[in-house]
Amino acid sequence: METEYSKRVYQGVRVKHTVKDLLAEKRLRQTNTPRFSTSSSSSQPAFVPMPGSHVLPGYYSMRRSFLQDSELCHTVKQYSSDTYSSALGSKAFSYDHASTYPAFIDSYYTPDSYGDYRGPTSYTTSGGSLFPPSSLPTLLPTLSGESSSHLLLRDPWDQPSEDSVNQTEVLCPEAAAPVADSPSLAGPDSGSSSPYRLTSGRSGSSIPSSSQPYTLQPLEDVPYTAPSYTSASSYSCPPYMSTPGDLAVVKMTAVTSEEASGGVVSLSDTTSWAKDDGTGSWLSYETRRAF
């Protein structure tokens, strides 16, 4: 008994039945009972190595036979080639032509409609019942003679020559009139009530008096005059926004007796900056700062 168990050592453990024994018993059961009960002839067993088959090493060094294609596909059961063809051939694929779709669709598949599609009559050869032949030409514009060439060759931004001439006559006096006719260059003391009003009495200008109800002023001009602005401040520098006439003639304003007695120092009086006798306002500021 010890000799039998000594042979059955599986990974250091004595076992009664090893995996090899179980596989051998299973293989014997498969060979004894037929695999396919319907097969009439006894073929070679599936796991028995045949002399012509290639033997591969299997699980736990057990030899297994490489099954060939002839062994897997048993020749006992033959599939006849006419099994499916006879079944399909008994009933042909046919359909009822009249009941599938209406008969008026056939008019679209006539050979006449597949002619030259660029021709003028290709749209009206076979319209069918859905689109009568008279409805298609009405959708297209009628181009004939000079009207067609005028519509095709003329750009959308083109304008007649007389319109462009009128526009230049209208736009040019608006830009040139404030420079030539504005009396602001003569000085602020010209005496005119509204020196910035655009005068439209130029020769060659076609602007009516009613087309410009408002007064046009240049961007750099201001509505008030220069003397009223400079009298409010004691600075002799010209304002930032002034008329060209004000820039040409700059008047130096003198310091009045009231401003001199009040201690207001004007920027135009350059002699006041040179005098520093220690009795000015700067000394009093320094003494106040010490506290």
UniProtKB/Swiss-Prot annotation:
Residues 200-211 have a biased composition (Low complexity). The keyword RNA-binding does not apply. Pfam families: POU2AF2 (PF17721). Keywords: Activator, Transcription, Transcription regulation. Residues 7-29 form the OCA domain. Residues 176-219 are annotated as: Disordered. GO terms for cellular component: nucleus. It comes from the Eukaryota. PROSITE patterns: OCA. Transcriptional coactivator that may regulate cell type-specific differentiation pathways. Belongs to the POU2AF family. In the N-terminus possesses a conserved OCA domain for bivalent binding to class II POU domain-containing transcription factors and to an octamer DNA motif (5'-ATGAAAT-3'). This is POU class 2 homeobox associating-factor 2.
